């Protein structure tokens, strides 16, 4: 029987091999849709929260607001987002998805889902349930760890 250390090494190597294969496919899929990973992050944030200030997106992305402003320029040129003045402070600009932006976001997700479906088709239904449970647990652990690091001032 393998030791915990050997199992962790096996998992790490398998995940690395999987990500090295999937990542270029995901990037190519986004490129075909005319969206960069950073732009997808903005679209996803707006989809989830409805409307956000440039500063809020910058904080989530850990970049300067000027970087988000440039990205917003490109997304607005493509009619994927709309800018409006904040109702409480007219100096503040809020970003939101347009109908076209919502459609584009769903198209990008569909492309990513198709890639994942190809790989997940090798699993049985039981294995998919296990994989869903394990990855959700790992994602939750990562989020908890990130929040703890931020509280300690390490994030």
UniProtKB/Swiss-Prot annotation:
Q: Which Pfam families match?
A: MarR
| Cell compartments where the protein resides | Cytoplasm
DNA-binding region range list: 54-77
Task: Name the Gene Ontology molecular function terms of this record.
Answer: DNA binding; DNA-binding transcription factor activity
Q: What is its main location?
A: cytoplasm
Record PROSITE patterns = HTH_MARR_2 (PS50995)
Query: What InterPro entries does this protein's entry cite?
Result: HTH_MarR-typ, WH-like_DNA-bd_sf, WH_DNA-bd_sf
Please provide the Gene Ontology terms (biological process) for this protein. Answer: regulation of DNA-templated transcription; response to stress
Q: Which UniProt keywords apply?
A: Cytoplasm, DNA-binding, Repressor, Transcription, Transcription regulation
The stated induction of this gene product is:
Part of the mdtRP (yusOP) operon. Negatively autoregulated. Induced by fusidic acid. The mdtRP expression is decreased during stationary phase, even in mdtR mutants.
Q: Where is the HTH marR-type domain?
A: 4-140
Q: What is the effect of changing residue 67 to T?
A: Significantly reduces binding affinity to DNA, resulting in derepression of mdtRP transcription
- What does the UniProt entry report for the null mutant? The loss of the gene causes increased expression of mdtRP, low levels resistance to fusidic acid, and resistance to novobiocin, streptomycin and actinomycin.
Per UniProt, activity regulation is: The binding of MdtR to the mdtRP promoter region is severely inhibited by adding excess concentrations of fusidic acid or novobiocin but not by actinomycin or streptomycin.
What PANTHER family does UniProt report for this protein, alphabetically?
TRANSCRIPTIONAL REGULATOR, MARR, TRANSCRIPTIONAL REPRESSOR OF EMRAB OPERON
The record's subunit annotation is:
Homodimer.
Q: What does this protein do?
A: Repressor of the multidrug resistance operon mdtRP. Acts by binding directly to the mdtRP promoter region, leading to the repression of its expression.
Protein name as catalogued: HTH-type transcriptional repressor MdtR
């Amino acid at each position: 029987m393998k030791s915990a250390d050997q199992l962790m090494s096996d998992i790490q190597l398998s995940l690395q091999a999987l990500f090295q294969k999937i990542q270029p496919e995901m990037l190519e899929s986004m490129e075909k849709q005319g969206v960069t990973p950073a732009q997808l992050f903005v679209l996803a944030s707006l989809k989830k929260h409805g409307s956000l200030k440039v500063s809020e997106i910058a904080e989530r992305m850990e970049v300067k607001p000027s970087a988000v402003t440039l990205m917003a320029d490109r997304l607005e040129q493509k009619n994927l987002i709309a800018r409006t003045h904040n109702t409480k402070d007219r100096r503040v600009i809020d970003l939101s998805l347009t109908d076209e932006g919502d459609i584009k976001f769903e198209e990008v997700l569909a492309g990513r889902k198709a890639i994942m479906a190809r790989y997940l088709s090798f699993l049985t239904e039981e294995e998919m349930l296990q994989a869903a449970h394990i990855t959700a647990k790992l994602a939750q652990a990562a989020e908890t760890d990130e929040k703890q690091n931020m509280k300690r001032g390490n994030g």
